[in-house]
Amino acid sequence: MYICNCSYTSKLKAVFFFGLILSLCCACSRAGARRVSSYDHYWVKAADERVEADRKWADYLFNHLDRRTGSRSVALRQKPVQGTFLQIVVHVDAKGKHDYSTVLDGDVLRLTACDEDKMLWLIYQFLASGEDPRIESSDLPPAMIDIAHAEGDFAFEYRGIYSPSNADPELMPVTASHHVDYDWGLWGHNLRRVFPGEVPEEALAWVDGQRDENQFCFSSEQLFKAVEAYVTDNYGETGGVRFAIMPNDNSAVCACKACTAAGNTRKVATPSVSRFIRRLAERYPHHLFFTSSYRTTEVPPAEPLPQNAGVIISAMDLPLRPDFAGKRPAENFSRKVKEWRKVVSRIYVWDYMRNFDDYFTPYPCLGVLSERLRYFYSLGVKGLFYNGSGYDYASFDDLQTAALACMLINPDLPLESYTERYLKRFYPHASDILLPAYLSWERIVKEREALLPFYGGIADAVSAWLDPVEFGAFCDRLDGCAKRTDGMERRRLNELLTALQFTRLELLRMPAGAYDERKADLYLEALYGYTAFSGMKNYREAFGSVQSYLEEWNILKTENRESQNPLKGIRLSCQPAEDENAASLPVLTDGLYALPSDYHTGWFIASSRRFVLQVPPGKISDGAVLELSLLYAPAWHIFLPASVEVWQGEGKMASFGLPPVGEKEVFSKQRVSCKLETVNPDIPVELRFMQVAAARASVACDEIKVY
């Protein structure tokens, strides 16, 4: 039984003494038991040959044992006539006390599960247990239970992981995990899919006196009939499929007469959306329908919804760091969950397991995720969706996905032990290098109570856990080991090492770091090997082409090589001094440029409506040309300034001519310059910036140069 081993539940104290006695008794009863591997044969038997499910799964276990032992008559469906044997009794019991149990009693091992899905998982726990070397299990993640004696309930009914290591539909049942691309009829903001052609006008929201093609009217009968046809035609009436019914991802709310009468306001669409979901839930009582606590549907409905309705709540505002419980974000999240529990029977949480700006730098998140899962369980959350890197490679994703699949069954999984068993199974030669490194990163995150950002740069990793010198030594040791391995381990290591070159390149780009073009060339050459791996085209969620990154780096090397700047090392000042990024002023004169695709590293970013950068007296001569390197990235609210003027004292000296930029441009670097004819060497030179009139506008500059 999963009992949360933390302060979130009062069950622990009540069962502690009983559990201690029980475990001691079990230990005594097993002390004389034989190991599974000590038997000549396995006699696989259905608990009741008259029950179809028992026969089916006994046959399944027999067939897979026969295949994985090489058909050496190790597995039998009839009682062996000679030799020692372990009888394995398979039983599907919907009325059992727990979701699963395994009991080794003498020479009989009983495998019991409450349904067929869990029986399949339990069979693979036996096959992956590693008890018998005759059973080939090198392709299976290590078992998470003691196959001789285990019983328990799955902590969560839905266990979704959106990661490349969970993308094989044949492996998902083995790990008892889910994937939104396979087990949801509708997921996310994809309601548009119910219309095979154009969305009819009557199904569109009425916003500011006209139809809005970017939002739906949830009082529309045409919308309801389209969803009804989609559900019936694709999934029937009895399947128990999950559907997410969400408005499009914007702030528009339908204000037609019907939606307004339902209770919609200018910012809240909950009344019309919840009424729509109620109709669907009543129409299809065997399917599950979910709304989202997000943007226009963040607040719960006033009245409870049917039992087959639920809500998906994002954990984006819950920082991914240790010891988060009891702090304000957790209190706010708990309050939201409790409010929704009053009106729905199912609460699923959309949580996150990656830095979406950097998939390649290791992200030691397992300890924090374990803590979060115990917290979610204590709140009565019934399902989790973990947003990972989708189908794109992420460093250590194989280990983390396997461990997370186990933690979604039991959040109290002993992480260090499981990590050790996983790495020794899949990296037998390199585990002595990988294991201490990975566990040390997890421990550092815990000790520092470090924040693991959902969107962050290399400086965030260094702040949280990464020691640049030790990391470089780790990569070198791992590279040496990889050259002595072969087969699948060699391929896995090559893929990991290729990704880690990205991290080494990012460390070279850090302000006040150790930029070295010779090392950059070595790391770039290794990163070009990404083409050998189908999942390594992108290093981040959006605009993350590895090929584009490599091309930007080649430009960057040229920029840095040509950066002969009299201002190099000169400290500028900024007004207002309280600007949130004043500490990054040194990047403006460090002689190192930044990448336009990454605003995290190497950029001075200012969001004040007006701000002034001041160059000390005597640093700019008559006739000098002053050059600014600016970032234009409107998707990140970074724009070219409306104006930049150069002043000394009360006199304006010059203005920078700012180029037009394409509205559809994602990001680009723009260099602008102006000539200063006469400069007073006794007075500072001021660069006065004015922001454009845009919401949350910022200006970013990576270098100020004089020539």
Predicted features and spans:
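Extracellular carbohydrate recognition and processing domains
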Residues: 653-677
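Short beta-strand-plus-loop segments that form exposed binding edges in beta-rich domains
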Residues: 688-696
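Short, surface-exposed beta-strand/strand-loop-strand elements in extracellular ectodomains
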Residues: 637-651
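Feature activates predominantly on carbohydrate-active enzymes
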Residues: 35-45, 52, 57-60, 64, ...
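Short, well-ordered secondary-structure micro-motifs within conserved domains or adaptor modules
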Residues: 73-98
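Structured mid-domain segments that build the active-site/substrate or prosthetic-cofactor binding neighborhood
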Residues: 222-223, 331-430
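Disordered, acidic Ser/Thr/Pro-rich linker "stalks" and the adjacent N-terminal cap
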Residues: 555-623, 629-640, 659-668, 696-707
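Catalytic domains of carbohydrate-active enzymes that cleave complex glycans
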Residues: 408-586
